[in-house]
């Protein structure tokens, strides 16, 4: 069992939590993490880039000058790719960059990412963070107390006060546990999980492992 310290939002240690080794103590395979991150970033691409070929550039129907006798090079159209304002050859066209990664592979990669954070002592467990109102100053104090520079805060469920309080803090991102992904985990220096969120992630990622 992975024994992890549990803190309150005042940065005081209040106990420990045992986390399942099949989720938080998995051997890390960098090539698998790389594959899943590539898939995530590829899925974000719009793929709307487009250039005009000779079929779509306006004009250029008339031969600019006769074939022989002018002393100039032969030209059949002012929209040739050789000309300024002409068409583009083999340029980018709209396309879909997404590629499939199996669900079990994505889940394994997430377990690896969380395991890496635990090994590097960058996984923080909090009992809870609760604010009576939306106040950036309250969240800024928590961040300052823990000395977080770039942190991913994982909640068991949506918390409007906390999410809005953290929205303007640079380097701080708040997500629900069901939206946790490999790219966000690796991108941030610290992964801060509420205890209930960690247990839900453990249940979800540990289900069906043999």
From Swiss-Prot:
Region Disordered, as annotated, extends over: 56-80
Q: Which UniProt keywords apply?
A: Ribonucleoprotein, Ribosomal protein, RNA-binding, rRNA-binding
Q: What cellular component GO annotations does this protein have?
A: ribonucleoprotein complex; ribosome
List, in alphabetical order, the GO biological process terms annotated in this UniProt record.
translation
What InterPro entries is this protein classified in? Ribosomal_uL4, Ribosomal_uL4-like, Ribosomal_uL4_dom_sf
| Domain of life (superkingdom) | Bacteria
Molecular function via GO:
rRNA binding; structural constituent of ribosome
Q: Which cysteines are joined by disulfide bonds?
A: none
Entry keyword Ribonucleoprotein: yes
Q: How does it assemble?
A: Part of the 50S ribosomal subunit.
Entry-linked HAMAP family: Ribosomal_uL4_B
State its role: One of the primary rRNA binding proteins, this protein initially binds near the 5'-end of the 23S rRNA. It is important during the early stages of 50S assembly. It makes multiple contacts with different domains of the 23S rRNA in the assembled 50S subunit and ribosome. Forms part of the polypeptide exit tunnel.
Family, similarity comment: Belongs to the universal ribosomal protein uL4 family.
Q: What is this protein called?
A: Large ribosomal subunit protein uL4
> What is the phylogenetic placement of the source species in the record?
Bacteria, Pseudomonadati, Thermodesulfobacteriota, Desulfovibrionia, Desulfovibrionales
């Amino acid at each position: 069992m992975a024994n992890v310290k549990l803190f309150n939002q005042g940065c005081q240690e209040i106990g420990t939590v045992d986390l399942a080794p099949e989720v938080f103590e998995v051997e890390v395979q960098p090539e698998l993490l790389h594959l899943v991150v590539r898939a995530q970033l590829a899925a974000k691409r719009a793929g709307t880039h487009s250039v005009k070929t000779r079929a779509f550039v306006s004009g250029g129907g008339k031969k600019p000058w006769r074939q022989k006798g002018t002393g100039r090079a032969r030209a059949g159209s002012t929209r040739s790719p050789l000309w300024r304002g002409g068409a583009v050859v083999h340029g980018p066209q709209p396309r879909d960059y997404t590629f499939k990664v199996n669900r079990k592979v994505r889940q394994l990669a997430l377990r690896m990412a969380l395991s890496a954070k635990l090994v590097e002592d960058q996984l923080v467990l909090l009992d809870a963070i609760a604010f009576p109102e939306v106040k950036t100053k309250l969240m800024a104090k928590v961040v300052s107390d823990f000395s977080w520079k770039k942190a991913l805060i994982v909640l068991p469920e949506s918390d409007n006060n906390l999410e809005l309080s953290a929205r303007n803090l640079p380097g701080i991102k708040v997500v629900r546990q069901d939206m946790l992904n490999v790219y966000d985990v690796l991108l941030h220096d610290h992964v801060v999980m509420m205890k209930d969120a960690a247990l839900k992630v453990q249940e979800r990622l540990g289900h069906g492992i043999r």
